[in-house]
């Protein structure tokens, strides 16, 4: 009886893992129609007098400005081109900081944030963290770095009901994402720790200071030349359509 139940559970786990892997593989080419975070925000608003209206419009990689790509990397994950989904040094530093009694500090890479935003609910439980690690590994396995950043920039929250670079650019600055300048891009990146608390379009002193620091980091990282490190490097025999 117990052995049969164990076998069934293992079989179920296998099929769930296979289904999740196929889903992540498909999203290498297909734009995600929505995210788990968008659904969560929509559900949160059901009890309010005015339900939340979600705004999001997909922009492909070549229509997203280099300023914004670099601003987000500088602000959120400066080792993005180097790691395989997890920044061990940042994790160790965050653990030491949290154990010292300071305010909770995260150490999520862009890859982890994509996994969390696309597939998972909010929270810090161990089951959710385990699923985040699983989806992060799949994303790093199946997607090139450019695709990870493309999905991130089209899915990240930038205000109440505002998701993705295009909606954020229009909402905060009245322009399309391709027309964001360097300062505007840095202000968008500056509010990412808490985009529902801070405004990129109406920055306070903290956001302005952080945006200035982000612009310095963009320069130190090499500017748009850094993005060359994100290009996939395949052997000559690799099919170009993959």
UniProtKB/Swiss-Prot annotation:
One of its GO terms (biological process) is regulation of cell shape. Keywords: Cell inner membrane, Cell membrane, Cell shape, Cell wall biogenesis/degradation, Glycosyltransferase, Membrane, Peptidoglycan synthesis, Transferase, Transmembrane, Transmembrane helix. It is found in: Cell inner membrane. Belongs to the glycosyltransferase 51 family. SUPFAM superfamilies: Lysozyme-like. The chain crosses the membrane at residues 12-31. GO terms for cellular component: peptidoglycan-based cell wall; plasma membrane. This is Biosynthetic peptidoglycan transglycosylase. It is a single-pass membrane protein. It comes from Ectopseudomonas mendocina (strain ymp) (Pseudomonas mendocina). It is an enzyme of class 2 (transferase).
């Amino acid at each position: 009886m117990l052995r049969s139940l164990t076998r069934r559970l293992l079989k179920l786990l296998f099929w769930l893992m296979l289904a999740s892997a196929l889903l992540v593989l498909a999203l290498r080419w297909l734009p995600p129609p929505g995210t788990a975070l968008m659904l969560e925000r929509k559900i949160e608003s059901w009890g309010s007098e005015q339900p939340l209206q979600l705004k999001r419009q997909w922009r492909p990689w070549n229509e997203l400005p280099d300023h914004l790509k670099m601003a987000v990397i500088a602000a959120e994950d400066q080792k993005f081109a180097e790691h395989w989904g997890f920044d061990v040094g940042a994790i160790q530093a965050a653990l030491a900081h949290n154990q010292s009694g300071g305010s909770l500090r995260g150490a999520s890479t862009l890859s982890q944030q994509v996994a969390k935003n696309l597939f998972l609910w909010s929270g810090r439980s161990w089951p959710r963290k385990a699923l985040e690690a699983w989806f992060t590994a799949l994303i790093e396995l199946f997607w090139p770095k450019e695709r990870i950043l493309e999905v991130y920039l089209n899915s990240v929250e930038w205000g109440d009901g505002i998701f993705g670079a295009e909606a954020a650019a229009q909402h905060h600055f009245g322009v399309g994402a391709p027309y964001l300048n360097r300062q505007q891009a840095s202000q968008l990146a500056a509010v990412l720790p808490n985009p529902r608390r801070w405004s990129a379009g109406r920055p306070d002193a903290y956001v302005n200071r952080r945006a200035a620091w982000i612009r310095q980091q963009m320069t130190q990282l090499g500017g748009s030349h850094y993005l060359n490190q994100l290009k996939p490097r395949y052997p000559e025999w690799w099919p170009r359509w993959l």
